[in-house]
Design a protein with these regions (language model features):
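Non-catalytic, mostly N-terminal accessory regions of nucleic-acid modification and defense proteins
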Residues: 1-177
């Protein structure tokens, strides 16, 4: 992936005063948020094209195993808010809203973006880098999400002196998400 090194450089800059295990959850949480938002957006556009008015019907998404993403948690909203000093709280609120709409995610998503030691300017810059689509059918076919997760888990593991997550485990995790 051509964007891997750029993302890693940003993640490394983001680190600052926080532990690698903490910024790992920041990065992987953003990747997940981008993925479900992209998947939602693709389904949303399909529903709009059908013209039946079901684009805000949660059941229409859940039927296709797509997480419903409320407007305040959609990537376009997050990206437009990236330069605000409150971006950390905006992301935490987005994670809470997603959990509220998707009961099987309750208590799973990270909600630690508003903490003071996380540089909000760098967080906004990281959000700006996420311009690639992770949740489209084409991305799923190319296993972009799996490759991104595998790359980051490998980098986080090697930077912390921990074990490397085998590709089979990454495939399992991504399969569970999808």
């Amino acid at each position: 992936l051509e964007f891997e090194n750029k993302l890693w450089e940003m993640a490394d800059k983001l680190r600052g005063n926080i532990q690698p295990s903490d910024y790992k959850s920041v990065i992987l949480g953003l990747i997940f948020l981008k993925y479900i938002s992209d998947s939602f957006e693709e389904k949303y556009n399909e529903l709009v094209a059908e013209g039946d008015g079901f684009e805000e019907d949660r059941d229409a998404y859940h039927e296709d195993n797509v997480f419903f993403v409320p407007p305040s948690a959609r990537w376009e909203f997050i990206k437009k808010s990236a330069k605000q000093s409150t971006i950390g709280q905006i992301i935490d609120d987005a994670m809470i809203a997603i959990e509220r709409e998707n009961k099987n995610l309750k208590g799973v998503l990270p909600k630690n973006y508003a903490r003071p030691e996380l540089d909000k300017t760098k967080l906004g810059e990281l959000i700006d880098l996420f311009s690639f689509n992770l949740g489209s059918k084409e991305s799923k076919a190319q296993d972009i999400l799996g490759r991104v997760y595998e790359y980051f888990l490998g980098k986080f593991g090697s930077s912390e002196g921990e074990f490397y997550t085998p590709p089979s485990i990454v495939k399992l995790l991504v399969g569970m998400i999808e």
